[in-house]
């Protein structure tokens, strides 16, 4: 048996058999082997889901050896990529082609198949999640058949498989609609929760990508606004020194130390939350899109996400604020 754990350490498994295909035939063979044994087969990505979605106690297929771009249509801004390719590797390859993903989340360690299958998303009212950028999929289903699907070919399968949770088969390739490379201007600044909530609609509609982080037990937030710059704009990233201080020292080492302290001494949670909120500073910079979207995450964390109607958000945050104060 092979021991597996997800990134956050919230799910573990000991699969009886782990397949490591390096080509399409290898994926078909893995599916056939599981079927012949009468066992369930789970695809494994990078383990960045917090739930036990990838837990496999019978057969698992690890696609980390099945990577890379297999086809490019620069004129149509469309690329086909193998399922085990990470978002980081994909972004690097797209850079050389003058292309980019239209939108993405703030982690790039996921495989492309795992990211779309679990509904990975970014921010921005006018931009969808990764699954909305998928033009076509190739899927190995339970009987070993290799099916291609798109909006025009097997549209019902395509609609389901884009966020299929690995339940419909093993994705072998993903064809993505891309956009020309672009530069994002980022403005990140501390703010007061009341002010953010009061201006929420204006802020959300006024930026291509808007989000805020609230620190419970206080009224401080970190507000992030990202906006596309005109084509041909020159990136103006933070200096290497500033990046090291902001991202490595403050957002990872200091934050990690605070988290460990709070777990060891829970009564210090409220005061340390306030300390963390008060060390935030404003920063403005611009860079190639994925370098702005993605944030380095060395501190392991567990996250739950809830979707609420936009016009209910202020009320929900107000209730959470009251609950946290108790």
Predicted ranges, named:
Residues 1-326:
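Noncatalytic alpha-helical scaffold of FAD-dependent oxidoreductases
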């Amino acid at each position: 048996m092979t021991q597996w754990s997800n990134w956050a350490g919230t799910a573990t498994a000991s699969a009886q058999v782990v397949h490591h295909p390096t080509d399409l035939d290898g994926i078909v063979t893995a599916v056939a082997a599981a079927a012949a044994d009468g066992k369930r087969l789970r695809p494994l990505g990078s383990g960045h889901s917090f739930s036990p979605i990838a837990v496999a106690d019978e057969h698992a297929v690890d696609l980390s050896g099945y990577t890379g771009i297999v086809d490019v249509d620069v004129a149509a801004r469309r690329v086909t990529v193998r399922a085990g390719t990470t978002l980081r590797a994909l972004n690097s390859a797209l850079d050389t082609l003058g292309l980019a993903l239209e939108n993405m989340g703030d982690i790039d360690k996921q495989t492309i198949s795992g990211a779309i299958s679990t509904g990975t998303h970014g921010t921005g009212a006018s931009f969808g999640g990764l699954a909305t950028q998928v033009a076509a999929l190739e899927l190995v289903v339970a009987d070993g058949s290799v099916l291609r699907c798109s909006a025009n070919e097997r549209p019902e399968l395509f609609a389901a498989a884009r966020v299929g949770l690995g339940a419909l088969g093993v994705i072998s390739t993903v064809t993505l609609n891309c956009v020309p490379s672009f530069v994002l201007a980022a403005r990140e600044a501390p703010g007061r929760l009341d002010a953010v909530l009061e201006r929420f609609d204006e802020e959300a509609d006024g930026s291509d990508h808007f989000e805020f982080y609230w620190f419970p037990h206080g009224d401080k937030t970190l507000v992030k606004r990202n906006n596309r710059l005109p084509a041909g704009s020159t990136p103006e990233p933070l200096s290497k020194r500033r990046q090291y201080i902001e991202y490595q020292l403050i957002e990872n080492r200091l934050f990690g130390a605070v988290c460990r302290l709070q777990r060891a001494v829970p009564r210090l949670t409220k005061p340390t939350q306030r300390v963390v909120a008060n060390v935030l500073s404003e920063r403005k910079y611009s860079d190639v899109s994925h370098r702005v979207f993605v944030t380095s995450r060395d501190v392991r964390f567990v996250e739950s996400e809830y979707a609420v109607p936009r016009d209910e958000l202020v009320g929900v945050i107000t209730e959470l604020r009251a609950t946290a104060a108790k």
